[in-house]
């Protein structure tokens, strides 16, 4: 039997939470207070997955706007949209400023390691 949309989404959320050391937000979106699908420290993640394996996914600006708004409401400083093409691999959409911070942090870690 095929997974329901909720079951497929939950699998993705659990996978993301495990990979980044976060937690799945159970019942996300069902209350005015619980938003986002995964929270890891100050990072708010909204997960989007395809039901069946696909070569493409449509990204909507409204997803990004909503994630940004909800992350601020939950007092999270950063947000990302995690997308899956229906397989067990996730890709992340982030703002340019967050990408710049990540690259600077990565370079700083490399400097310390050398």
Walk through the language-model features, giving the residues of each.
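Catalytic phosphate/metal-binding cores of nucleic-acid and nucleotide-processing enzymes, i.e., regions
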Residues: 1-114
